[in-house]
Design a protein with these regions (language model features):
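Generic low-complexity, intrinsically disordered sequence content enriched
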Residues: 12, 18, 40-42, 63, ...
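Acidic/polar surface patches and capping/hinge elements
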Residues: 48-278
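N-terminal secretory signal peptides
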Residues: 1-8
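N-terminal export leaders
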Residues: 8-38, 199
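Protruding loop/beta-arch "assembly-hinge" segments enriched in small, turn-prone residues
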Residues: 274-300
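Ser/Thr/Pro/Gly-rich low-complexity linker/stalk segments immediately outside membranes or between
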Residues: 37-47
Length: 300
């Protein structure tokens, strides 16, 4: 593969994963020839650290936007994400239940998935290539090789850090990659992430690809991974596909959104109670007042 071809392929991958749009939105890169910071004549090495500083919060926003689209796929509501996918409700849904907060917190802090199992996916996302058959949005085609390479290097450093890789980011990039495979038009439109731009039916197709550990998806993630890591990658994706749906549903129907951790009380009626018609816990329980007629044993 020629250098030019590699640049086109890497540009396509970063765009499909949602990274380039997030970087542009955060000001980490400017898609013009004279745009800062690239007009100042700084070297690529001098640009990496400030780009990383801008890219980190941009990637967090990318992850949150993607998770918003995922949770509304599971429990739609009256929010913009649900309406955009074509399946919504007049009642509150996962967004109002703060399910994205629950899911991101669970993925990044509590999911019992050791970092060594997440690492193959993170490594794959850091080195993946993709074909350039999917047309990119106009502003992203104006990126210079220096801009592309700088963002690319910043992403690799973030994913290759010795710190624990946020699982929510790894999942978000994977969902966005599959989203553009299902519908290339998801590269364009509202929201930050391609996955959130999909219709409800297309989101279902994307989840099906992940749950089925589609060979094309594994190939797109990293053609350079050795076979043992390919097997690990497939296993992680298969686990993630099912867990995302389950965690989203659990979070939406739990008391998470109105639970006060300090007082350990509910501050309001949980969204899940309203959706399911649950009337709430009983105000009290019958107290034990002794044995009937003083009996303490039974003789047969």
């Amino acid at each position: 593969m020629t250098t030019h071809r590699k640049q086109l392929s890497r540009r396509a991958f970063l765009a499909r994963a949602g990274v380039l749009s997030a970087a542009v939105a955060a000001g980490a890169i400017v898609p013009t020839v004279t745009g800062l910071p690239f007009a100042s004549g700084e070297t690529k090495a001098g640009l990496i650290d400030p780009v990383i500083a801008l890219l980190r919060p941009a990637l967090q926003e990318l992850a949150r936007d993607t998770i918003n689209g995922l949770t509304t796929f599971v429990v739609p509501g009256s929010d913009p994400y649900s309406k955009a996918q074509g399946v919504s409700s007049q009642a509150a849904g996962s967004i109002q239940a703060k399910t994205p907060d629950f899911l991101m917190g669970a993925l990044d802090n509590f999911v019992p998935l050791p970092n060594e199992y997440v690492r193959p996916v993170a490594a794959a996302l850091a080195t993946a290539v993709s074909d350039d058959k999917i047309p990119l949005p106009g502003d992203l085609t104006k990126l210079l090789p220096l801009q592309l390479n700088t963002v690319d290097e910043a992403l690799k450093r973030i994913l290759a850090t010795d710190e624990t890789v946020p699982l929510s980011l790894v999942i978000a990039m994977t969902l966005n990659l599959v989203a553009t495979q299902v519908n290339p038009a998801s590269l364009h439109g509202a929201f930050v992430s391609p996955f959130s731009r999909l219709s409800w039916a297309d989101k279902g197709k994307a989840m099906s690809l992940i749950e089925g550990t589609d060979s094309d998806l594994v190939q797109a993630l990293d053609v350079n991974l050795p076979q043992p890591l390919h097997q690990s990658l497939s296993g992680v994706l298969k686990f993630v596909g099912g867990a995302l749906i389950e965690f989203s549903a659990f979070g939406a129907f739990s008391e998470y959104g109105v639970f006060n951790k300090q007082t350990k009380t509910l501050t309001g009626k949980p969204v899940g109670w309203t959706i399911s018609g649950y009337g709430g816990i009983a105000e009290g329980w019958d107290d034990f007042k002794g044995y009937y007629q003083g009996r303490k044993k039974v003789e047969g």
